[in-house]
């Protein structure tokens, strides 16, 4: 399984960060974030961590990262300094470290990086969305008008989010906001052309040739 997350901020002592996340201290924040992460991620999963891992130049943050399961890939953020990147490399915490990553998943293409980046064709049949963090917004669709989906811990109850859940979220966003005009609900969720104005929830195309997957399963 593929997971995406960002903005652990391990060792960040400032209350303005950990208090809004529902914690009483930065130590509690670190322990709960690690617990949540390891509850859902398996050792053979792939995890894209989109920056701002640690906030102190000591062993605390590194030890936190070592406790996280999965094959971890880092898209570095503004707090991932050269010194910290060097430490990540020496300790072999990540499989790879880059500015960003692009992956294709089904009909979607995702550009993943730390800072939000406006995408030009996120409304198209084969959309490209930016997965990013940095802003610490709680609304994962705060910048959806620019094709940006927020994967930071703040927007996902301090858990990483799976790529399947992201796709499900985006499909529902398209439907709820009528970015693709709804006729047959099945086609809208699947982002395919509807060939009927039937109101029974299915068009003839869907009945004849149902698409794989889909919000309704």
Question: Predicted segment positions?
Answer:
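Cysteine-centered metal-binding/redox modules
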Residues: 179-217
């Amino acid at each position: 399984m593929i997971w995406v997350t960002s903005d652990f901020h391990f060792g960040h002592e400032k209350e303005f960060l950990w208090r809004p996340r529902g914690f009483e201290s930065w130590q509690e924040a670190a322990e709960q974030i690690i617990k949540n992460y390891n509850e859902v991620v398996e050792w053979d999963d792939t995890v894209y961590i989109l920056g701002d891992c640690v906030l102190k130049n000591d062993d605390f943050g590194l030890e936190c990262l070592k406790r996280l399961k999965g094959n971890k890939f880092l898209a570095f953020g503004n707090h991932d300094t050269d010194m910290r990147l060097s430490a990540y490399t020496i300790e072999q915490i990540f499989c790879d470290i880059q500015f960003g990553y692009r992956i294709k998943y089904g009909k979607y293409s995702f550009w993943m990086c730390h800072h939000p980046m406006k995408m030009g064709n996120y409304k198209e049949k084969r959309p490209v969305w930016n997965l990013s963090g940095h802003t610490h917004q709680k609304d994962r669709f705060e910048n959806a008008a620019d094709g940006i989906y927020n994967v930071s811990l703040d927007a996902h109850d301090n858990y990483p989010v799976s790529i399947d859940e992201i796709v499900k979220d985006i499909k529902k966003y398209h439907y709820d906001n009528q970015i693709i005009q709804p006729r047959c609900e099945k086609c809208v969720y699947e982002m395919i052309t509807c060939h009927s104005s039937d109101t029974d929830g299915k068009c003839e195309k869907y009945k004849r040739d149902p698409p794989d997957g889909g919000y309704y399963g």
